[in-house]
UniProtKB/Swiss-Prot annotation:
Signal peptide extent: none
Amino acids binding substrate: R97, R107, R135, D226
Protein name in UniProt: 3-isopropylmalate dehydrogenase
Membership in a protein family: Belongs to the isocitrate and isopropylmalate dehydrogenases family. LeuB type 1 subfamily.
UniProt pathway annotation: Amino-acid biosynthesis; L-leucine biosynthesis; L-leucine from 3-methyl-2-oxobutanoate: step 3/4
Binding site for Mg(2+): D226, D250, D254
Pfam families hit by this protein: Iso_dh
Reactions this protein catalyses: (2R,3S)-3-isopropylmalate + NAD(+) = 4-methyl-2-oxopentanoate + CO2 + NADH
Function: Catalyzes the oxidation of 3-carboxy-2-hydroxy-4-methylpentanoate (3-isopropylmalate) to 3-carboxy-4-methyl-2-oxopentanoate. The product decarboxylates to 4-methyl-2 oxopentanoate.
Broad EC category: oxidoreductase
Organism annotation: Mesorhizobium japonicum (strain LMG 29417 / CECT 9101 / MAFF 303099) (Mesorhizobium loti (strain MAFF 303099))
Binding site for NAD(+): 77-90, 290-302
GO MF annotation terms: 3-isopropylmalate dehydrogenase activity; magnesium ion binding; NAD binding
Assembly, per entry: Homodimer.
Length: 367
């Protein structure tokens, strides 16, 4: 069995505590299942700034580039609020995404049955929810040029951001969405604003052409992004895979996340293009939640999003679909048993800490 190389970047705040539970899981899989994982660990975010004066060092960046997959914890905290903008903790994640050319951000929105009552929507609206939002991550208004603030000289200023998409960017992100849909319910909804944006017109055209040429077996719908936001709240279970641009994906994925009852429960993946020779994609997996410095070191952080991110790693980087299914099933089973960390605790449940939750999930996974 070929060795599977993982590079771990726990980061700041609760990142190291959550990552510790994944490290235990990896060790258990190697020992009990012979999974063949090899791990190395580096610094990212504020801790990297403290050690190297940069949000990620060149040496750790090289290790990330060489790994089969990167597991990322969280970055940031008040300690680093005053550091220069270009070396702020978040710059480490941005460099990873840029240098690894991670253009496809996968954001699942899954409502675990045991937590359906925690959603702000009616239980029947969200129970059984399983949506995957595929967000284009390296183009659009966040990266388009010009991007500047101009002094107009009359006491007024003008802020400029530019929304830009080329055909190939839309082709490759829609291709990822269609391929993923084939492994799910075979349904893609593409969202843009073609009624007011030329980039939306092109997006609609290219997605339609890509579908016709290569993925005609997948059901395709188009929806204006603002209507999509409304429909996510009205009846989210109509969706399977949603593909959209960087800006709308940023907004819609957070809307979808809150349907589930706790944004702190959700994983994500960022994928690059397949290597020409190996056909493998560079990939980074991370929980959606932040570094939560207010609870760091207290042993109460919820490790589920980090563990679920590792499940995505098993599925998308290593093709270990059965193991990914079992791990996701173990998370659901532990929640069904009533175990809760502080952030998702409710009366009648059993409150546990970070380590206890991790141990319970690992035991259920291996059992």
């Amino acid at each position: 069995m070929a060795t599977k190389h993982l590079f771990l970047l726990p980061g700041d705040g609760i990142g190291p505590e959550a990552m510790a539970e994944v490290k235990k899981l990896i060790s258990a899989m190697n020992e009990k299942l012979g999974s063949g994982f090899a791990t190395d660990e580096g610094l990212v975010g504020g801790c990297a700034y403290d050690a190297h004066g940069a949000a990620i060092s060149d040496a750790d960046m090289a290790k990330a580039m060489a790994a089969d997959a990167v597991l990322f914890g969280a970055v940031g905290g008040p300690k680093w609020d005053a550091v220069p903008y270009e070396v702020r903790p978040e710059a480490g994640l941005l460099r990873l995404r840029k240098d690894m050319e991670l253009f496809a951000n996968l954001r699942p929105a899954i409502c675990y049955p045991a937590l359906a009552a925690s959603s702000s929507l009616k239980q029947e609206v969200v129970e059984g929810l399983d949506i995957l939002i595929v967000r284009e991550l390296t183009g659009g208004v966040y990266f388009g040029e010009p991007k500047q603030i101009i002094d107009l000289g009359n006491g007024q200023k003008r802020g400029i951001d530019t929304q830009v998409y080329d055909t190939f960017e839309i082709e490759r992100i829609s291709g990822v969405a269609f391929e993923l849909a084939r492994t799910r319910k075979n349904h893609v909804t593409s969202m843009e604003k073609r009624n007011v944006m030329k980039s939306g017109v092109l997006w609609n055209e290219v997605v339609t052409q890509t579908h016709k040429a290569r993925y005609a077996d997948v059901k395709l719908d188009h929806m204006l992004a603002d209507a999509g936001g409304m429909q996510l709240v009205r009846w989210p279970k109509q969706f399977d895979v949603i593909v959209t641009d960087n800006l709308f994906g940023d907004m819609l994925s957070d809307i979808a996340a809150m349907l589930t009852g706790s944004i702190g429960m959700l994983p994500s993946a960022s994928l690059g293009a397949p290597d020409v020779k190996t056909k493998k994609r560079k990939a980074l997996y991370e929980p959606v939640h932040g570094s939560a410095p207010d609870i760091a070191g207290k042993g109460i952080a919820n490790p589920i999003a980090m563990i679920a991110s590792f499940a995505m790693c098993l599925r998308y980087s290593f093709g270990m679909v059965d193991e990914a299914d079992r791990l996701e099933g173990a998370i659901a089973a532990v929640l069904d048993q009533g175990l809760r960390t502080k952030d998702i605790f409710s009366p009648g449940m059993t409150e546990v800490g970070t380590v206890e939750m991790g141990d319970a999930i690992i035991a259920k996974f291996l059992g």
